[in-house]
């Protein structure tokens, strides 16, 4: 399996190289914003990397040749943050519905939400919250306890728990009501 994984990485590297070699010859290349991201982790040989939330850790790359964007960050973000990050980069200021945040806005909260092992998991800095329909099930400090052996749920910040529960509830409401556009929110929310 390690050889298969290595082959997949080598192929991806080759394919991206070929793509960018051809794309760089096109007139639209310089002003195009490219987003490169995986949809899941690699299933690495490391046991820890096969558990949540690590199994969903992937890099994301924003590349626009004419923008001169440079830098690396290890801040928490997720696929949900891609659209809210791209729109300001592209100069779009219209209203939109999104459950993510602008990764480059320091005033935005930076947490990632995923569905792991039958629970909603939220990574917020070093903390990993796990929620079920009953509420907060567990809380781990990933930096101090990467193998998630010590549940520190009793030390959870009630304001954060409330925020994350509201986030999950709003997600369900939006999906159930198919409220994906500002027009579908109702006048009191859209303004």
Which role fits each region the language model picked out?
Residues 1-191:
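Solvent-exposed soluble domains appended to multi-pass membrane proteins
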């Amino acid at each position: 399996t390690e050889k298969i994984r290595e082959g997949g990485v080598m192929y991806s590297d080759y394919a991206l190289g070929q793509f960018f070699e051809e794309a760089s010859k096109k007139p639209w290349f310089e002003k195009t914003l490219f987003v490169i991201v995986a949809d899941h982790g690699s299933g690495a040989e490391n046991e820890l990397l096969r558990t949540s939330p690590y199994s969903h850790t992937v890099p994301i790359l924003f590349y626009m040749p004419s923008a001169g964007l440079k830098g690396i960050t290890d801040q928490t973000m997720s696929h949900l943050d891609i659209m809210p990050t791209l729109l300001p980069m592209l100069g779009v200021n219209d209203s939109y519905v999104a459950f993510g945040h602008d990764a480059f806005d320091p005033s935005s909260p930076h947490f990632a939400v995923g569905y792991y092992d039958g629970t909603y998991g939220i990574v917020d800095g070093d903390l990993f919250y796990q929620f079920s329909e009953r509420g907060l099930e567990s809380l781990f400090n990933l930096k101090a306890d990467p193998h998630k052996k010590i549940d520190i749920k009793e030390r959870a910040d009630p304001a954060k728990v409330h925020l994350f529960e509201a986030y999950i509830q709003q997600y369900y409401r939006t999906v159930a009501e198919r409220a994906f556009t500002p027009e579908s929110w109702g006048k009191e929310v859209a303004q």
